């Protein structure tokens, strides 16, 4: 009889946000598939959990997913986790879940925090309709194509961005989407959690003087003002 894959949400910053059900699940499975085993080990140690782990990330290749699926088909249970938040969101976990569906492996969700939804709720922007766009490509051509494709969307746009790329991303957003209202959420649920609101041009000016720190979630309104120089 096949085992089961548990999709387990982990904290996006504050370890106290790990649910009791998630703690129970991580403690009972046969093994854990982790984006970065070093990050997950810190979480397990905090909750006094000892479990064997295998790494599963975007550079793992198809064989790692096949190996995990084979173990599940042999009757083992596995929890898939990402470094922070829900697996499968801007994360290769979706490929493992798809493979489990194809092979008839039972899947169970153990929901947890999501940086995108948390940031949207804190942004004060329209939450009735939104589009999660993940990380923009590092290639300028692909970034421009992505932004051009969504520039007329009538919904709030949500992006993830790393601190070292934030300035370039703000420049690209301004150039392609115009000078929209934006909310920058950083270090969500951590000590230095911050929400900064204004126009894209104001954010560009802000970070001429400041060095971006921490992981960012960007939320933009869908109505653009005329682009200003």
Where are these regions (language model features)?
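Class I SAM-dependent methyltransferase SAM-binding "motif I" and its flanking Rossmann-like core
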Residues: 95-153
């Amino acid at each position: 009889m096949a085992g089961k894959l548990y999709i387990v949400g982990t904290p996006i910053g504050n370890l106290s946000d790990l649910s009791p059900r998630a703690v129970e699940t991580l403690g009972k499975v046969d093994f854990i598939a982790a984006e970065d085993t070093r990050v997950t080990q810190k979480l397990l140690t905090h909750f006094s959990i000892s479990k064997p782990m295998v790494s599963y990330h975007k550079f793992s290749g198809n064989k790692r997913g096949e190996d995990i699926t084979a173990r599940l088909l042999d009757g083992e249970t596995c929890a898939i986790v990402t470094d922070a938040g829900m697996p499968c969101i801007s994360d290769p976990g979706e490929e493992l879940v798809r493979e489990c569906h194809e092979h008839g492996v039972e899947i169970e969700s153990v929901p947890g925090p999501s940086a995108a939804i948390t940031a949207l709720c804190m942004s004060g922007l329209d939450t009735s309709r939104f589009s999660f766009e993940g990380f923009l490509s590092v290639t300028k051509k692909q970034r421009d194509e992505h932004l051009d494709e969504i520039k007329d969307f009538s919904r709030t746009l949500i992006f993830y961005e790393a601190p070292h790329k934030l300035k370039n991303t703000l420049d690209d957003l301004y150039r392609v989407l115009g000078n929209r209202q934006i909310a920058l959420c950083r270090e969500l649920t951590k000590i230095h959690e911050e929400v900064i609101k204004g126009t894209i041009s104001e954010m560009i000016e802000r970070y001429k003087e400041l060095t971006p720190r921490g992981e960012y979630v960007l939320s933009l309104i869908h109505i653009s003002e005329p682009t200003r120089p």
